[in-house]
């Protein structure tokens, strides 16, 4: 199935099987196995969707690996079809050939997972066992991993030496309805107290006692919860960010990958700020975005600042690999139906149309510790019947960055500029999750409504 809308329907039965398996394992008291099964389910939609697209990896090594995988997989599929249609006299020979082909493919995938785990996630569902995940966490960090079932919400709360599961009876349809109302009211700056209380009661309150001792919490959402601004949830008598710094990841496997890439990279101290690219229409100008980019020099005096007609897609694609911190203040375009065409809008020129799409980002080679996407809805991706969110964030992680700061909705220009200023200022001596928390508190002291400060979130690892 090549068309994504049809493909999501095709995956519905697969995902319902994952759901039933998670529920069955939980009912049997096998919370650890249920978690690991949930983790496997997160990558399935991403892999199947990419199977319908031609992604061009950034390095020749990656291209060669994908070509090798495709050749080995095609051999398995061809022999499988021949075996199914073979006469009895031919079946034994074909069965042996098929067994050899499957063995070769399996050995290749095992090697690819060891050498290049992120690339392997394009062709096989990665597995992240609990013990390996816990080794990544320090004493002040916990994870909350969600799985939305049709009639309950599951949350695993994981620390370096702790593992608990919380099950809350609430229908998925109710979560979807309340979250939709909440986001509409939020973006209109309306009263959100009722929806805020309901969502916090489902998402945070049941796990509150299990977060004791943590200074930061990693959120791994599921399905529609990717669209939830967790920094605006309630904890006790205040917001969760009054006590805890937050970071996000689409899956536990992505956290492992960002840690591994951080170790492998030679860190660059160079900073690039891109602001208000010339998109050919005055109506698309973002004056505060240009100021925002220029003010990066307040925190990083040697930063390269590129704005207006100079901020072309061609220039960015050619030079982005040189920088350790990259800040892009521009429009973002979220394509719900074709997520690989979601884009950061840059200036067009004679070589490129200016749309730095998800598809194109997969082909870049980036060595940045941090990419900040100060644009409209850059953090959103398509959440289908599978879960692994396909958006700009995942593409930038694959291309090489460890952390992405991005937005869930159209964020107010002035409030964003203030938040970004404090975020970079707070990075000195703090991890980035804490730097963002402090920046959100600063903005909240001036602009009380969560629409001003809860839209930006940090995805990847927290360091």
Spell out what each predicted region is.
Residues 1-239, 263-278:
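Amphipathic alpha-helical protein-protein interaction segments
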Residues 41, 144, 155, 217-219, ...:
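Residue-level detector of buried hydrophobic side-chain packing
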Residues 93-96, 100, 223-225, 260-333, ...:
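A domain-level signal for caspase-like cysteine endopeptidase catalytic cores
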Residues 146-148, 220-223, 249-250, 274-278, ...:
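Active-site-proximal beta-strand/loop segments in catalytic clefts of secreted hydrolases
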Residues 151-153, 164, 225-228, 254-255, ...:
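Flexible loop/turn segments at secondary-structure boundaries
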Residues 161-164, 170, 180, 222-288, ...:
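Boundary/activation segment at the start of structured domains
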Residues 252-255, 264, 324-422, 426:
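Catalytic cores of nucleophile-dependent amide-cleaving enzymes
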Residues 414-463:
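An often Trp-containing, charged/polar helix-loop segment at the C-terminal end
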């Amino acid at each position: 199935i090549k068309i994504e809308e049809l493909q999501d329907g095709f995956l519905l039965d697969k995902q319902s099987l994952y759901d039933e398996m998670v529920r069955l394992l939980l009912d049997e008291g096998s919370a650890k196995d249920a978690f690991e099964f949930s983790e496997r389910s997160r990558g399935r939609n991403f892999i199947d969707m990419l199977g319908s697209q031609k992604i061009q990896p950034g390095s020749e090594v990656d291209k060669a690996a994908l070509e090798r995988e495709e050749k080995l997989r095609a051999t398995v599929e061809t022999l499988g079809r021949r075996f199914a249609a073979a006469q009895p006299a031919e079946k034994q020979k074909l069965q042996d050939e098929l067994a050899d082909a499957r063995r070769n493919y399996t050995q290749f995938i095992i090697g690819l997972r060891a050498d290049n785990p992120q690339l392997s996630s394009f062709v096989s569902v990665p597995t992240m066992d609990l013990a390996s995940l816990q080794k990544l966490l320090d004493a002040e960090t916990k994870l909350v991993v969600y799985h939305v079932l049709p009639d309950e919400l599951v949350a695993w709360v994981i620390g370096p030496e702790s593992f608990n599961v919380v099950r809350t009876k609430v229908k998925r349809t109710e979560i979807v309805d309340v979250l939709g109302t909440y986001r509409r009211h939020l973006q209109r700056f309306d009263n959100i107290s009722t929806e805020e209380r309901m969502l916090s009661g489902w998402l945070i309150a049941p796990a509150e006692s299990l977060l004791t001792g943590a200074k930061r919490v990693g959120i791994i959402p599921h399905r529609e919860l990717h669209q939830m601004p967790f920094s605006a949830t309630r904890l006790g008598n205040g917001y969760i960010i009054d006590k805890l710094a937050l970071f996000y990841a689409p899956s536990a496997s992505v956290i492992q990958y960002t840690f591994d890439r951080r170790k492998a990279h030679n860190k660059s101290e160079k900073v690039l700020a891109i602001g208000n690219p010339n998109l050919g229409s005055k109506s698309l100008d973002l004056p505060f975005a240009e100021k925002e980019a220029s003010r990066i020099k307040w925190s990083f005096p040697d930063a390269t600042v590129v704005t207006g007609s100079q901020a072309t897609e061609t220039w960015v694609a050619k030079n982005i690999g040189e920088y350790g911190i990259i800040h892009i203040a521009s429009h973002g375009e979220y394509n719900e139906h074709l997520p690989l065409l979601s884009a950061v809008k840059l200036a067009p020129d004679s070589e490129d149309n200016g749309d730095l799409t998800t598809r194109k980002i997969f082909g870049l080679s980036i060595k940045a510790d941090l990419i900040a996407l100060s644009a409209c809805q850059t953090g959103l991706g398509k959440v289908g019947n599978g879960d692994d969110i396909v958006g700009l964030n995942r593409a930038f992680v694959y291309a090489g960055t460890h952390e992405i700061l991005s937005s869930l909705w159209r964020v107010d220009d002035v409030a964003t500029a203030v938040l970004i200023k404090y975020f970079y200022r707070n990075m000195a001596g703090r991890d980035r999750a804490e730097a963002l928390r402090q920046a959100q508190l600063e903005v909240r002291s001036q602009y009380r409504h969560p629409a001003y400060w809860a839209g930006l979130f940090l995805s990847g690892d927290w360091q």
